[in-house]
Amino acid sequence: MAIDAATVRKVARLARIATPEERLEPLAQELNGIMTWIEQLAEVDTDGCEPLTSVVAAGLPLREDVVTMGGDPARVTSNAPKSINNFFVVPKVVE
């Protein structure tokens, strides 16, 4: 798939990225290079390869969930800029 300046312009507009006209052609060349690399990756034979979520095959040890009374609320909120009745007070962000 070849990417031209018009495609870069369209993608930039959809992404709401201000792109000067003189940068469209260099960006198209860079994106074409990336697409070539992706096409090379698509040609790699991965049959028989187990999908990986990590290159290190290590898991985390599980522990039993234990219900506790929690920490000292006064001590936890002592560093807060503002707290009321041991609750953090934060600026309102939703009307």
Curated annotation (Swiss-Prot):
EC number, as in UniProt: 6.3.5.-
What molecular function does GO assign, one term? glutaminyl-tRNA synthase (glutamine-hydrolyzing) activity
Look up keyword Endoplasmic reticulum and say if it applies.
Answer: no
Under catalytic activity, the entry for this protein gives: L-glutamyl-tRNA(Gln) + L-glutamine + ATP + H2O = L-glutaminyl-tRNA(Gln) + L-glutamate + ADP + phosphate + H(+); L-aspartyl-tRNA(Asn) + L-glutamine + ATP + H2O = L-asparaginyl-tRNA(Asn) + L-glutamate + ADP + phosphate + 2 H(+)
Give the keywords, sorted: ATP-binding, Ligase, Nucleotide-binding, Protein biosynthesis
Would you say which domain of life the source belongs to?
Bacteria
**Keyword Thylakoid included in the entry's annotation:** no
Residues annotated as transmembrane: none
Gene Ontology biological process terms from the UniProt entry = glutaminyl-tRNAGln biosynthesis via transamidation; regulation of translational fidelity; translation
What this chain does, per the entry, is described as: Allows the formation of correctly charged Asn-tRNA(Asn) or Gln-tRNA(Gln) through the transamidation of misacylated Asp-tRNA(Asn) or Glu-tRNA(Gln) in organisms which lack either or both of asparaginyl-tRNA or glutaminyl-tRNA synthetases. The reaction takes place in the presence of glutamine and ATP through an activated phospho-Asp-tRNA(Asn) or phospho-Glu-tRNA(Gln).
* Similarity section: Belongs to the GatC family.
Q: How does it assemble?
A: Heterotrimer of A, B and C subunits.
User: Sorted alphabetically, which HAMAP family does this protein's record hold?
Assistant: GatC
Q: What is this protein called?
A: Aspartyl/glutamyl-tRNA(Asn/Gln) amidotransferase subunit C
- Give the species: Caulobacter vibrioides (strain NA1000 / CB15N) (Caulobacter crescentus)
